[in-house]
Amino acid sequence: LPFTRLNGGPMDYTPGIFVQDLASVTDGKNTSWVNATIANQLALYVTLYSPLQMAADLPEHYEQFMDAFQFIKDVDIDWIQSKYLLAEPGEYVVIARQGKKDGQWFCGGVTDDHKRTVEVPLQFLDPEKTYEATIYRDAEDAHYKENPQAYVIEKKTVTFHDFLPVTM
C-alpha cells in the first residue's frame, strides 16, 4: 500500500492492535490472529497515511501497555511533509513525516515477515539542531506469532549526521 494506493493520497486504516489473539476477546469464537507486533502496529501510524486516525483495540488492552500507548497519544495525524527514506516494494519501507501540529518528526518502518535491520539516515533533520529521539522498537525476542508484545522504548540523542540502526 505505501507504494501504490498511498502515493495518491490518504486511506482509511486502523492500526493500534496490542492484543493480537482475537480468540481472547471473543470467547474463542474468532480464532483469527493479527500478524503484527506492538512495535509494528505503532509504526503503521506513520507509514500508512490516514489523517482520520483512531486506536483500534480495546481500552483495557491499552491499559496493559500504557508506555506504548503513549505513542498513539503523541503521534501527529497529518503531515507537513513526508520522506521515503528506505524502501524495497513488497519487503520493507521506512518513512519520516513532519507533523503539522508542531513540526515534530516521526519515523516509522515496517517489514514483511522477514526480520531485518536497516540503517536509517537522519538527513531529513535540521542540520543545526540536536534531537532526542524516543524509539519504540521490537525487542530482540519479538515475533509476530510467538511474542508479539515484546517491545523496547529507548531514548537517544541524534543529529542530521547520524544513521539510526532499526531492527524490524
Regions found by a protein language model. Name each.
Residues 60-70:
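A glycine-rich phosphate-binding loop feature that marks nucleotide/adenosyl-phosphate handling sites
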Residues 51-55, 76-79, 100:
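Alpha-helix capping/termination and helix-coil
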Residues 69-97:
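Edge strands and adjacent loops of beta-rich recognition modules
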Residues 12, 43-48, 95, 106-109, ...:
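Structured core elements
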Residues 54, 59-61, 111, 137:
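A mature extracytoplasmic/lumenal domain signature
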Residues 89-131:
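Carbohydrate-binding surface patches
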Residues 113-168:
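C-terminal beta-sandwich/jelly-roll accessory domains of carbohydrate-active enzymes
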Residues 1-59, 85-87:
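Glycan-recognition surfaces
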